[in-house]
Regions:
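Non-catalytic helical/linker scaffolds that mediate oligomerization, partner binding
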Residues: 1-279
Length: 279
């Protein structure tokens, strides 16, 4: 069994990473929705890989692309959203992809930061959305965004994704996580991009994050090397009580096909405040 951690500020030192490897971690994920591979050069070359060698672990380095995932743009500082208040998305307000503004209709709901915040669209204009805050909190840059119940057009790979893939060989990337896989074509696009860069040996991990991914699971299984059950956004696409059975259904299908899989999102989240994991 593999055990992956996520690289971040709290574990960005060689001694901490060495201890994590010694405790059983076999690889780490780097979220490229918030950074780039060149920006992480010192973390990878001076901390991560030396820690793996010191611990005697043949580690995996997984890069998590942005892909079709929707995110809030960059904010100069966090924006407080107060329950019952209003929020403007788009021109003159919180930056969001234009495709979201074009797809949204009054009454639609928008979840932010893996459902930590929830908005209802009250008015949809050509360049902005006026929303009511149903569940408030502090919104930070580049947090996830989902227009619930609607599909929003977005490319398999962004320009930033392709730039990061071009650096993957230099930094020893072993696996690529493709978010919001919608079917076979997304994975063929990624595999073609890797082949053009001479990265045929890099493994593809397909993230199942919505109902469309579940519906296309059989064809996704044929093209992916590994399946990732991403509970955060998957939970946004269905009522919460359906999530456990959906997770088990994907796992059962993977086992039947002999396809490796793993589960992510908030597995040890409760330990941010408690000494013993409850989730």
């Amino acid at each position: 069994m593999d055990l992956y951690g996520t690289l971040g500020a709290s574990c960005a030192r060689r001694e901490i990473l060495t201890a994590m490897f010694q405790a059983g971690m076999t690889g780490a994920r780097l979220n490229l929705s918030h950074t780039t591979l060149p920006e992480c050069a010192s973390l990878l070359e001076e901390e991560f890989w030396p820690a793996a060698r010191q611990a005697g672990v043949e580690a995996s380095l997984i890069v998590d692309l942005q892909g079709p995932e929707l995110r809030v743009g960059r904010l100069e500082e966090p924006v407080p959203l107060r329950e019952g208040g209003s929020a403007l998305l788009g021109a003159g307000g919180i930056p969001v992809p234009r495709s979201v503004v074009e797809a949204a209709r009054p009454g639609d709901q928008i979840s932010l930061d893996d459902s930590a915040l929830l908005l209802t669209v009250e008015e949809a204009n050509p360049d902005c959305l006026t929303c009511r805050v149903e569940r408030g909190g502090l919104l930070k840059s580049r947090k996830s965004l989902a227009l619930l119940g609607r599909e929003v057009d977005s490319p398999t790979l962004t320009a930033e994704d392709r730039a990061n893939l071009a650096q993957a060989g230099r930094f020893g990337v072993t696996h690529v996580l493709q978010p919001f896989v919608r079917g076979r074509e997304d994975l063929l696009t990624l595999r073609s991009a890797l082949a053009e860069l001479g990265l045929d040996r890099v493994k593809i991990m397909a993230k199942i994050e919505n109902r469309r991914g579940m519906e296309k699971l059989d064809e996704i299984l044929e093209e992916a090397d590994v399946i990732c059950i991403a509970r955060g956004d998957l939970g946004n696409s269905m009522p919460l009580w359906e999530l456990p059975s959906a997770q088990k259904r994907i796992a059962r299908t993977c086992r039947a096909a002999g396809k490796p899989f793993f589960v992510v999102t908030q597995l040890l989240w409760s330990m941010e405040e408690r000494a013993v994991p409850t989730r």
